[in-house]
Amino acid sequence: MNASRIGPAVIVFLGALYFVLPLVATFEFSLSMLRGIWSFEAYRVVFADPQFRTTFSFSVIAALATIVLGALLVVPTAYWVRLRFAKLRPLVEFITLLPLVIPPIVLVFGYIRLYNSSSWLPFTNSASGTNLLLVFGYVVLSLPYMFRAVDTGMAAIDIRTLTEAAESLGAKRATILFRVILPNVRAAVLSGAFLTFAIVIGEFVLASLLNRPAFGPYLALIGANRAYEPAALAMIAFAITWACMGLLQLFANRAPGRARSGRPLFKLARRAAR
């Protein structure tokens, strides 16, 4: 190996050790619940815990609801900003980036104050209302990631030409959006969806202060009262996050601007008009 390559290789190796060693140590500790042998006893205990199944199921359902609401909000917004309201683009980008600046604790206290039992819209009076409020909060937290992913996908296709072609064939606006534009940004929407899923699964502040049985507060509770199970849960959460990142990369590598079957864009416009 050339001397000029040794330095970068050493830096990469040390950086890899910095990230990999804590994971290896955590995984090794999670296998040490039974003295003297390595076993998956901690994982068995975690998966056998009814509270784990309840909280994880709750967070998965909340994540799916967040993805649906986020996509319904972001896809039309990104479409209209690129098609008709280019001057509003800086404002829309500023609004979508606010969740990165404003702490979640500020958001949740605002929700509690605005939608408490004495409010004109008392969401916190019922479990279903509080769950809905939690999903709204998750949508806000996921806006920077969902909007950026969808907007990047729309930048890769000619929205104006597609819209004009579909309109010339008699397609309505809703048809254009859902049958022409959406199939071409499907990979971008899925990328934002996987990021949203990873965020919601581990979110703690909103779920804890709204007193919802989510996976994030469960992780904190187990971490405060157990020894080996938190390590197992950390590895499970890590695996879920990296699975989402892998799926994101898989869909992101797909060529934009083509339908699922590989047909050109103008054929989508013709099909939408039928």
What do the PLM-derived regions correspond to, one by one?
Residues 158-162, 262, 271:
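Short glycine/proline-centered loop/turn elements that form peptide/ligand docking sites
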Residues 2-35, 48-155, 184-204, 211, ...:
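Membrane-water interface segments at the C-terminal ends of transmembrane alpha-helices
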Residues 166:
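The alpha-helix within a helix-turn-helix
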Residues 35-48, 210-223:
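Short hydrophobic, aromatic-rich alpha-helical segments embedded in or entering the lipid bilayer
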Residues 145-148, 160, 179, 204, ...:
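Short alpha-helical elements of helix-turn-helix
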Residues 169-170, 183:
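Glycine/proline-centered hinge or cleavage motifs at structural transition points of membrane proteins
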Residues 255-264:
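Short, Lys/Arg-enriched, Gly/Pro-containing loop segments at transmembrane-helix junctions
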